[in-house]
Amino acid sequence: DAKLAESPQELEAFLRVFVEAGVDCLHCSQRRFWEAEFEAVDGMDGLNLAGWAKKLTGLPTITVGSVGLSTEFTGAFRGESSKTRPLTDVIERLERGEFDMVGVGRALLQDPFWAQKIFAGNFEDLSDYDAAALKTLY
């Protein structure tokens, strides 16, 4: 899998350029937000890319990567669908401050009312992702 850096030290050096340039928030996209960025350092349940970026820079971060879905985005370009995935882990990580915001992609393409359903607590009304959503205009 593609990674920006092989270690926290490499990531810190990469991010330093942005911090010194005055960036005030980092949007940290990875294919599956729930995966640890440096598993060898802090285990399978370790910080994701946004968590490490926040830890290393002190800046607010946005996590994104298959939020609410079970497979990564590249399958959508091959016409593959994706089942919904519970939001428990993203909520827990957000509440403990691992990252500050959450970006959502395909789940919103599938259902433009996704955020309203989440806000209302209607998780059971969330839809699986169908690649045809890429061709749908609401």
Predicted regions span which residues?
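Flavin-dependent oxidoreductase catalytic cores
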Residues: 1-138
